[in-house]
């Protein structure tokens, strides 16, 4: 639908395998498509509207209607006592992600909010497939699920396009200009969470109060591999620290993802 041929995909994989720069014109085209995906996401109706019209305004209207339908379902299907709490949790997600440290806090949902009051409401949203949780881990070692901290997690929208539609008007235009670093990196992080989730991967991260924070952890070839997301070519201080102390963190290599060429 976007004119990308299998040979282009094969070429891109070859460049990644060899850690070689992608041809500038091909890189620019894939980058353009990535920015479009951030705005459109993967909801079938939104994708169809974009392919048929190429009008972001129509896509945004569909996405915001879907978000409104989610809210209506919360009122329709949830228990009476949970209805306002579910909506509060859902509507807090952009604010949760816009903070420097993106751990989900119930006090952000409502001042004085506690986990025991809202845990069931957040679970309802997760069970509906609207969000994905990303759990903090005790260590940067396998097994990731066995090391997860149940009470510490970030919450991402399952569909990046829906997250962007929940932000203020004009965000889409900024993204098309290549500005993926807004909201303290929330858009770029949620993009990676969207991609990993659609690959069938559970989400984990690593944060310690000493200042070490790795955006994602994944199992790859029998190892724990950190993933650092930097929309710009910023420093990955935590990654350098972890790689510099293999005896402590047991990490041999890491992946840095950004909006730039190899």
Predicted feature locations:
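Short catalytic-loop micro-motif centered on adjacent basic/acidic residues
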Residues: 204-205, 226-229
């Amino acid at each position: 639908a976007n004119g990308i041929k299998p040979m282009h995909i094969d070429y891109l994989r070859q460049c990644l395998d060899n850690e070689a720069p992608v041809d500038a014109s091909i890189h620019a085209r894939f980058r353009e498509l990535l920015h479009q995906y951030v705005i459109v996401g993967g909801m079938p109706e939104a994708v169809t509207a974009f392919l048929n019209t190429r009008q972001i305004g129509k896509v945004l209207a569909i996405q915001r209607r879907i978000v409104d339908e989610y809210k209506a379902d919360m009122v329709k299907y949830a228990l009476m006592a949970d209805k306002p709490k579910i909506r509060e949790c859902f509507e807090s997600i952009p604010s949760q992600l816009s903070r420097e440290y993106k751990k989900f806090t119930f006090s952000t949902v409502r001042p004085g909010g506690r986990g025991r009051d809202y845990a069931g409401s957040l679970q309802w949203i997760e069970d509906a497939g609207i969000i994905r949780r990303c759990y903090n881990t005790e260590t940067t070692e396998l097994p990731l699920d066995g090391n997860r901290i149940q009470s510490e997690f970030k919450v991402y929208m399952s569909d990046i396009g829906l997250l962007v539609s929940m932000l203020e008007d004009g965000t889409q235009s900024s993204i098309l200009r290549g500005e993926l670093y807004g909201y303290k990196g929330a858009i770029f992080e949620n993009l990676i969470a969207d991609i990993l989730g659609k690959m069938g991967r559970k989400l984990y991260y690593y944060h310690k109060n000493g200042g070490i924070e790795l955006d994602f952890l994944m199992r790859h070839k029998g190892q724990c591999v950190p993933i650092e997301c930097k929309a710009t070519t910023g420093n990955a201080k935590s990654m350098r620290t972890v790689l510099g102390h293999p005896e402590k963190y047991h990490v041999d290599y890491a992946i840095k993802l950004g909006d730039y060429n190899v």
